Amino acid sequence: MLQLLAAASPIDHVVDWPIFSANGWWILTNHMVMMLLAALLMVLIFPAITRHYADGKSVPTGSRNFLEAIMVYIRNDVVKPVLGDKTDNYISYLWTLFFFILFCNILGLLPIDLLTGKILGLGHHGNGIYGTATSNFWVTATLAVVAFVVIQLTGIKNLGIAGWAKHFLGGAPVFLAPIMIPVEILGMLVKPFSLAVRLAANMTAGHILLAVVIGFVAMATSGIGMTGGFLVGIPSVLGAVGIMVLELFVAVLQAYLFTFLTTLFIGQMAAHHGHDDPHHDENPGHPQAVSGH
């Protein structure tokens, strides 16, 4: 929380800052470093879990057990009910998507500025490298574009180019094409846009709220002295702790929502493959599962 007190405004710790720049171009920024750190953690953690099984230790312990429980839940309870037999075709991507967003979200809550700023002297004006990369719209937009490409490639793979193009009619007669095609294209583009905006907005709003609450202490101290700062500080700090707990919940929730909605959109494109299949409706109890023919 120290960077929040030191910030000149509530958004100083949310916006991206250049660490190295040349000729006006930002070469390396806070958010780039935070994304690299999240990726590094994934590279270090998940191969270790794989080696654990390769060594014949089939029973996970400690943090491995926790991470495996999350992975099993995502596969069996989030992805498989939607994608069915095609789950294994997409699970690696969806696992990577979930944990990358989750790690970026959680790293933004950790006070690593104490190490990078006070000890190493890095970051914006030496205040340290910190920030939530997923509060940056361009980061979330990139994740959404990748999801968009995966979704459309799924449609092309299942339907072929002609079938994929035909699905823009939405099952309507050809004479309605001038109306249906623009509507379908708009809907196709709105999906990734909503993914990007939802994640960035939620991660940004929480940090700004936390900065405002903590900022009450500094404003009270400068306005009415140390006594006033102390009196205002007690409820402010308690409120900030509550917000931090809420932020942790939101960090997990937003990673889950992004992954879940991406899975649904993939499932919608994959499900088109079964529309002309005479056995498509044989299992009415599980209409959301994609048949893996």
Predicted regions span which residues?
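Selective transmembrane helix interface/packing segments
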Residues: 1-293
